[in-house]
Amino acid sequence: MARSIKKGPFVDDHLAKKVAAEGTGSKKVLKTWSRRSTITPDFIGLTFAVHNGKKFIPVFVTENMVGHKLGEFAPTRTFYGHAADKKSKLKKK
């Protein structure tokens, strides 16, 4: 279910303070563990280092990302492809 409009978008307080102190268009990368924070229009032009559980993934925020969560742009799982079918390998030989 979507968040109520009267509540507004959720942004962690510590992240909002970092963004306000940094200013728009800064080259400095803002390191954050807050994957749950919603991207607001003041984030446009900033680069965040979003933690994916193992390392920090750089995410440059554009206009199209507004309204999404930071965690959507830092995948936590690595897909190596589906396992090969043993029967089809034996049949080909």
Curated annotation (Swiss-Prot):
The keyword Ribonucleoprotein applies. Gene3D superfamilies: 30s Ribosomal Protein S19, Chain A. PROSITE patterns: RIBOSOMAL_S19 (PS00323). GO terms for biological process: ribosomal small subunit assembly; translation. Pfam families: Ribosomal_S19. GO terms for cellular component: cytoplasm; small ribosomal subunit. It comes from the Bacteria. Keywords: Ribonucleoprotein, Ribosomal protein, RNA-binding, rRNA-binding. Transmembrane segments: none annotated. InterPro entries: Ribosomal_uS19 (IPR002222), Ribosomal_uS19_bac-type (IPR005732), Ribosomal_uS19_CS (IPR020934), Ribosomal_uS19_SF (IPR023575). GO terms for molecular function: rRNA binding; structural constituent of ribosome. Protein S19 forms a complex with S13 that binds strongly to the 16S ribosomal RNA. Belongs to the universal ribosomal protein uS19 family. NCBIfam families: rpsS_bact. This is Small ribosomal subunit protein uS19. It comes from Geobacter metallireducens (strain ATCC 53774 / DSM 7210 / GS-15). The lineage of its organism: Bacteria, Pseudomonadati, Thermodesulfobacteriota, Desulfuromonadia, Geobacterales. The gene is rpsS.
